[in-house]
From Swiss-Prot:
Its EC number is 3.5.4.2. The active site is at E197. HAMAP family: Adenine_deaminase. GO terms for biological process: adenine catabolic process; hypoxanthine salvage; nucleotide metabolic process. Catalyzes the hydrolytic deamination of adenine to hypoxanthine. Plays an important role in the purine salvage pathway and in nitrogen catabolism. This is Adenine deaminase. The record marks H218 as: Important for catalytic activity. The lineage of its organism: Bacteria, Pseudomonadati, Pseudomonadota, Betaproteobacteria, Burkholderiales. Binds 1 zinc ion per subunit. It is an enzyme of class 3 (hydrolase). Keywords: Hydrolase, Metal-binding, Nucleotide metabolism, Zinc. It comes from Bordetella avium (strain 197N).
Length: 316
């Protein structure tokens, strides 16, 4: 089934570019930029990829991002991800990037954006992969910081298809960012938001009602709220689910417990994504294969999941 899944056209709608930083590239960029790493070698870094929760992962994720310094670094990161898309039958991707992760350590916004944009343009031309970039705000930082990031981004308004909300979920409900999302919406930028991963179903309601999002990133805890499930079935708001991520971060103890196929059969608009593939052990194809192995996903279910992803893109 792997060859069939590889050939199946699909979109990826929940991928953090910084989370596609493979250990080999991380070490190469550290050497290029003279960055001293806390790990002696690639094997030691891989051994550090053990997390009990989202915050433990994020601590490592932000540490790894420190090697990204130049436009070429961001190009190389994005291009490596796009090559993986081409290998796995991903024909359209809408990646997130976290400018605050970089600007807060002195990397200019334009440096980050230029490298990513150049790679996405080359991906369209050379690999035939369509794409749209999502500007994500870090929810563990104050809304004022997100507003400053939006100010910095607006001169490049045409570079983005949407704004998003990510980072530590617990204790940082979507309502804290209502003003900055309203401002982005006034500028013509639609919204997506991470909700219902570690946070409760109430966070999904807030993202829908107060941030007016077009998609929910993760959303697996919607299953705990029958009224929310009925609403999501009725509205067909897409949920960008990331199975390997959910298991690695202990949202589910084992892939056999994951609810994504139950959600699909209930009529929810779910699709499969990799989230932070370098850190969670797989890209989109590996996520599909995990569902096949542990949940017995059928070809018909895989076809529906892929069709959902393509129907849920924000850019044509």
């Amino acid at each position: 089934m792997q060859d069939w899944l590889t050939a199946l056209p699909k979109a990826e709608l929940h991928i953090h570019l910084e989370g596609a930083l493979e250990p080999e590239l991380l070490f190469a960029l550290a050497q290029r930029n003279g960055v001293t790493l806390p790990w002696p070698d690639i094997d030691a870094l891989r051994q550090a990829y053990q997390y009990q929760n989202l915050q433990e992962f994020l601590d490592l994720y932000y540490q790894g991002a420190h090697v990204l310094r130049t436009e070429q670094d961001f190009y190389d990161l994005t291009w490596a991800y796009l090559r993986k898309c081409a290998e796995q039958g991903v024909t359209h991707t809408e990646p997130f990037f976290d400018p605050q992760t970089h600007t807060d350590r002195g990397v200019p916004f334009q440096v980050v954006l230029s490298g990513i944009q150049a790679a996405l343009a080359d991906g369209r031309r050379d690999l035939g992969i369509q794409s749209g970039l999502i500007l994500s705000f870090l929810r563990h930082l104050p809304e004022e910081a997100a507003m400053r990031t939006l100010d910095e981004a607006l001169p490049y308004r045409d570079a983005f298809i949407a704004v998003g909300l990510d980072s530590s979920e617990a204790g940082f409900p979507p309502r804290l960012f209502e003003r900055v999302f309203a401002r982005a919406r006034a500028e013509g930028l639609p919204a997506v938001a991470h909700a219902g991963e570690e946070g409760p179903p109430e966070y999904i309601w807030e993202a829908l009602e107060r941030l007016q999002v077009k998609r929910i990133d993760h959303g697996v805890r919607a299953w705990e709220d029958p009224r929310l499930i009925a609403h999501l079935v009725d509205t067909q708001i897409p949920l960008t689910v990331c199975p390997l991520s959910n298991v690695r971060l202990q949202v589910f103890e084992h892939m056999g417990q994951h609810n994504v196929l139950e959600m699909l059969e209930r009529g929810l608009n779910v699709c499969i994504n990799s989230d932070d593939p370098a850190y969670f052990g797989g890209y989109v194809l590996e996520n599909f294969m995990a569902l096949r192995e542990h949940l017995g996903m059928s070809q018909e279910q895989a076809r529906r999941l892929a069709a959902n992803s393509l129907a849920s893109v924000l850019t044509a």
